[in-house]
């Protein structure tokens, strides 16, 4: 049995190819069934995200399997091998195990250390469980990878620092305000960055969340998810004073929040401080706002400096994380090799039990026929000894005849001979 991992990701393939090799939730069950129908495949997991598509497999043997799997992948997605081969990577054994551990820990992600990938790996694992496509070895490998990812998060600082604009904005807010549960937040816009910020702030249980957007319908979808109030862009001037934190990211060519608007809001707030985080390019907040007392304005460039500093911290943490992966993958492979001996041990024990039972039955029969008990006992011990040492004796003799000193020493060690 061999463990394999093959696939493409953001480092090896452009998005134009990645999107053509994606397995959608609607097609995943069919894909797993098709994959498991391939010769020599004992178990399979399909991991498909926007940045990677990977197959994790346990196979009877790996000889000639690479061409078979590439052909299956290309046939399934109606691609030619030439389109895929240059972007495909292939790992087996310890390399496959360590690759999965790195993926689950966020060490192979576009954003180093990002936590979302672990949830995606767990979902892929659960999908294979439901589809009954997991082998025992694959199940153990994935469970081990989950524990390694948890250990990496616990023992290193891989996830402690913000490395996305949205997360950096929220981290900045948490640094300035002791608790987000007492603050009101106004989000301006409803794009991806604002969506991420809204979810993060919702998780930290802000007191009140407001979303202002040009398209009310889009804002309402996000607001329903994060329990926010939707307001129009025209309402910002009137409602700005309610906000302790403003995070803005729109595509407006002109500023939405001007100096006069913030001055009026601060007056209503009796000069209680406001944090304004302007992520937009062009800027949503007039730069002169930053000159106002009690108005703390940060631009996307300010956040980028935080992100770059934090990325350096994550890269240092990644070195520690890689050490954990090396150790854990080695431990897993040792366990896997030990498992290969389990069946042999079981067969050897069964063989010994069979010999014991046969000779024991004969001895009991002799005793029942009145034979001398001491003679029967000695005869049983002699015959059982001969049965048990017969195969090892033949192996020792053959190794000696072949002049194979290394095999002879292995046999001696196995038999406990000094």
Swiss-Prot record:
Name the site position(s) for Important for activity.
99
An annotated GO BP = protoporphyrinogen IX biosynthetic process from glutamate
Residues annotated for substrate binding in this entry = 49-52, 109, 114-116, 120
Q: Which reaction does it catalyse?
A: (S)-4-amino-5-oxopentanoate + tRNA(Glu) + NADP(+) = L-glutamyl-tRNA(Glu) + NADPH + H(+)
Active site (record annotation): 50
Miscellaneous section: During catalysis, the active site Cys acts as a nucleophile attacking the alpha-carbonyl group of tRNA-bound glutamate with the formation of a thioester intermediate between enzyme and glutamate, and the concomitant release of tRNA(Glu). The thioester intermediate is finally reduced by direct hydride transfer from NADPH, to form the product GSA.
Give the family from UniProt: Belongs to the glutamyl-tRNA reductase family.
The record's note on quaternary structure and interaction partners says: Homodimer.
User: What is its biological role?
Assistant: Catalyzes the NADPH-dependent reduction of glutamyl-tRNA(Glu) to glutamate 1-semialdehyde (GSA).
What is the protein name for this chain?
Glutamyl-tRNA reductase
